[in-house]
Swiss-Prot record:
Top EC class of this enzyme: transferase
Protein name: Palmitoyltransferase ZDHHC13
ANK repeat windows: 43-78, 81-110, 115-144, 148-177, 181-211, 216-245, 249-277
Ranges for domain DHHC: 426-476
Organism: Pongo abelii (Sumatran orangutan)
Cytoplasmic side: 1-291, 342-347, 392-470, 540-622
Keyword annotations of the record: Acetylation, Acyltransferase, ANK repeat, Cytoplasmic vesicle, Golgi apparatus, Lipoprotein, Membrane, Palmitate, Repeat, Transferase, Transmembrane, Transmembrane helix
Membrane-spanning residues: 292-312, 321-341, 348-368, 371-391, 471-491, 519-539
């Protein structure tokens, strides 16, 4: 058996179905308890001068191994389990010993063990990326198969070692390489590893979705359905896997799902088939192109209808309530059938723009006669034009999406791996790029964003390095617009409604303004709502920028870290806080009559520490 009794090896090399998280961080899932016990039971070697070369290799006792080899031990000689010294060094990640044995003539691709594996196979099973890199640099062949018929990339997939998968593919290993059964890595992932990864990770490398294996002629989608792997089915459908290919039994993926009686997968496949069938109709394709516009129009009409019902000439609030319930029921049907799930995230944006539209119409139609010629009117017009401009700039400007070509991605992966930096702190497994400082992957936009602040619901856009300053002005002018409409509402009531606030109090006053103009009260409530959240966010943003020098994401992350630490972290004492004036100058990229000069940093390509000449501080990621 390969590697019995060693604390730093995987003792079970079978390839059955594995639970989610199997093999992550370089440790096999089934290894956890057995390996922990083995490590505890493994005795310490007090005197290494008498141990044999196999044990010395396992423990990484370099001097003892060197002594025995120079005394005449053949490094190619396998032990009684048919395992070479290079295998033992590889599985225990003994880099210095591997270099030494290879220099003494060890065969880098020597087969050994029960599974007839190479040292590279053993290193991959354990997730030892540095060892994999070293063996490949010394000529190891990643295309060789072991006794189970798996090559290097298949083992990396089965054990869910994503960094090794990325490195092998970047070094030229085909993502569509087949094992002895004609199965690609994507097929093995969909069938053997329950969960979204590494199926989703493999799809980043554009594997063939519709290739079939030799024996069953199943596609990756067939294998995912056969295993009941819901996450893999979802990933493959999203990537565009065919629903019509039949296997050797003449079964489509839906036929297999029906046979297995997996109701969730059946629903997913039928829904996807219906959506793809609708794509054939020109009207449906036109509706998809106009989804956002239709969503906006629906929101505008719905908000008008709500106000119309409230302003309806009837004293029966029961009738108005029934009409409102009916309205919301009817309008909820439209997004469900005509607007895709991905575009529903723009619903708050449509609500905001619809609110501003009716705010403007109310001001122009109802409030204009009372405020015509006054400076408040022109201030309102300026505020709403500025709001629309900065909303557009916030939405249309690239927030700082990090981009890289396929070749650049592979070069980055190789560079990071060979420098020991290929981990989740510096590498994005979704974008396959090196992450700049202060960046974060947004799962809504599906991209890494430089100097990430948040994904704003109200703009439907990420807020980052490229559009953060526009976002501040967007909040400011939205607060101004809502503030003017609140002021205009009270001016309107004082001019057009008979109120007795001083005589009868607040409750009577509210009844009087509701009876006078429910529409104006409705618009006031909308304006008050938008004024509240926009003003709160504006003040919060300005505080973070001027006094902390942090983004919203960084502030929240530091606060979470502080909860798990004995000593409370100070948000003011961060490398990014350069003082009130310098923080503002850096953020808005403007000086102050030569007293303060901004430091220009391109956060989309900033991977190392930054030296700030103004304060002689070193900026680091938080």
């Amino acid at each position: 058996m390969e590697g019995p009794g060693l604390g730093s090896q995987c003792r079970n090399h079978s390839h059955g179905p594995h639970p989610p998280g199997f093999g992550r961080y370089g440790i096999c899932a089934h290894e956890n308890k057995e390996l922990a016990n083995a490590r505890e039971a493994l005795p310490l070697i007090e005197d290494s001068s008498n141990c044999d070369i196999v044990k010395a290799t396992q423990y990484g006792i370099f001097e003892r191994c060197k002594e025995l080899v120079e005394a005449g031990y053949d490094v190619r000689q396998p032990d009684k389990e048919n395992v070479s010294l290079l295998h033992w060094a590889a599985i225990n990640n003994r880099l210095d010993l591997v270099k030494f044995y290879i220099s003494k003539g060890a065969v880098v691709d020597q087969l050994g063990g029960d599974l007839n594996s190479t040292p590279l196979h053993w290193a991959i099973r354990q997730g030892h990326l540095p060892m994999v890199i070293l063996l490949l640099q010394h000529g190891a062949d990643p295309t060789l198969i072991d006794g189970e018929g798996f090559s290097s990339i298949h083992l990396a997939v089965l054990f869910q070692h994503m960094p090794i998968i990325a490195y092998l593919i970047s070094k030229g290993q085909s993502v569509n390489m087949t094992d002895v059964n004609g199965q690609t890595p994507l097929m093995l992932s969909a069938h053997k590893v329950i969960g979204p990864e590494p199926t989703g990770f493999l799809l980043k490398f554009n594997p063939s979705l519709n290739v079939v294996d030799k024996i069953h002629q199943n596609t990756p989608l067939h294998w995912a359905v056969a295993a009941g792997n819901v996450n893999a089915v979802d990933k493959l459908l999203e990537a565009g896997s065919s629903l019509d290919i039949q296997n050797v039994k003449g079964e489509t993926p839906l036929d297999m799902a029906l046979q297995n009686k997996n109701q969730l997968i059946i629903h997913m496949l039928k829904t996807e088939a219906k959506m793809r069938a609708n794509q054939k109709f020109r009207l449906w394709r036109w509706l998809q192109k106009c989804e956002l516009f239709l969503l906006l129009m629906l929101s505008v009409i719905t908000m008008w209808a709500v106000g119309y019902i409230l302003d309806f000439n009837s004293d029966s609030w029961l009738l108005k309530g029934c009409l409102l319930v009916t309205l919301f029921f009817l309008t909820s049907l439209f997004p469900r059938f005509l607007v895709g799930y991905k575009n529903l995230v723009y619903l708050p944006t449509a609500f905001l723009l619809s609110s501003v539209f009716w705010i403007f119409m109310t001001w122009f139609i109802l409030f204009f006669p009372d405020l015509a010629g006054a400076p408040f009117y022109f201030s309102f017009i300026f505020s709403i034009v500025a709001f629309l401009y900065f909303f557009y700039k916030t939405w249309a400007t690239d927030p700082g999406f990090t981009k890289a070509s396929e070749e650049e991605k592979k070069v980055n992966i190789i560079t990071l791996a060979e420098t020991g930096s290929l981990d989740f702190r510096t590498f994005c497994t979704s974008c396959l790029i090196r992450k700049p400082l202060r960046s974060l992957h947004c799962h809504v936009c599906n991209s890494c964003v430089a100097r990430y602040d948040q994904h704003c619901l109200w703009t439907g856009r990420c807020i980052g390095f490229g559009n953060h300053h526009y976002y501040i002005f967007f909040l400011f002018f939205l607060s101004m617009v809502c503030g003017w409409i609140i002021y205009g509402s009270f001016i309107y009531w004082s001019s057009h409604c008979a109120t007795t606030f001083k005589e009868d109090g607040l409750w009577t006053y509210l009844n009087q303004i509701v009876a006078c103009s429910p529409w104006v009260l409705y618009i006031l409530m909308l304006a008050t709502f938008h004024f509240s959240w926009s003003t709160f966010l504006l003040l919060n943003q300005l505080f973070q920028i001027a006094f902390l020098g942090l983004t919203s994401h960084e502030r929240i992350s530091l606060q979470k870290q502080s909860k798990h630490m004995k000593q409370t972290l100070s948000l003011r004492k961060t490398p990014y806080n350069l003082g009130f004036m310098q923080n503002l100058a850096d953020f808005f990229q403007c000086g102050c009559f030569g007293l303060v000069k901004p430091c220009v940093v391109d956060w989309t390509s900033q991977y190392t520490v930054v030296f700030h000449p103004a304060r002689e501080k070193v900026l680091r990621s938080v």
